[in-house]
């Protein structure tokens, strides 16, 4: 799949990022991951991101990363395109990018580098180096320490033909509007704030109709139904979903830092697809919080 074909796929539909399965000892659980992918693939997501942020990329060893990406690519070979999360320091990100390409990933989600303070010129050089290390399409994730400006993105677009997507995890509306107006159709634009459904209608109005859904991991039917309501501008249905599910969900998610990942794993377990515990430094939901989530999920009906 060439980068422009990937861009076309990412320009419509719902995206998601499967959690990574661990066993009771915290090691990668391949059979559970295959079962998860086989469950989720038929629901109709346009693409899935393996080893992304919700897939705990930041906690994976290099050997595990290779097994996870290969498992995802092989399992979904005939059903849904797999993009691989990559990140870390530049040389590390390049190694991950080239490994994902070798294993057959259709594209990459370039996650922010971890912790290190850097100028945005330096971040742009990092993005350029990763893009030039592979031939497959790359989506850059503006979030946390990665805050690329319209000018820098325009320069990167000129230098890196395979940079085909921009994912926004900042929520800076002025910046998003500036990027969307400046770059036009050069990129596919993805909403990437945690629990992106809450912002989906607003982002669609800005020209960003596509987003990635975390809750697709455990209420896939609801996630797809909500996306279709957004796509057809059914504001009444959207409002009902937000009132009945997403706002109560946020009340649980916002209890602790890191719960944006932990609550998804808890939901997957309740749904019958236990992915095991999160890895430190993340912490799992408490039993009471799991009960609250289970009650909320039960109200949504069969998935």
Swiss-Prot record:
The keyword Lyase applies. It comes from Pseudomonas syringae pv. tomato (strain ATCC BAA-871 / DC3000). It catalyses: 5-dehydro-4-deoxy-D-glucarate + H(+) = 2,5-dioxopentanoate + CO2 + H2O. InterPro entries: Aldolase_TIM, DapA-like, Dehydro-deoxyglucarate_dehyd. One of its GO terms (molecular function) is 4-hydroxy-tetrahydrodipicolinate synthase activity. Pathway: Carbohydrate acid metabolism; D-glucarate degradation; 2,5-dioxopentanoate from D-glucarate: step 2/2. It comes from the Bacteria. Keywords: Lyase. One of its GO terms (biological process) is D-glucarate catabolic process. Belongs to the DapA family. This is Probable 5-dehydro-4-deoxyglucarate dehydratase. It holds the Pfam family DHDPS. The keyword Lyase applies. Transmembrane segments: none annotated. Its EC number is 4.2.1.41.
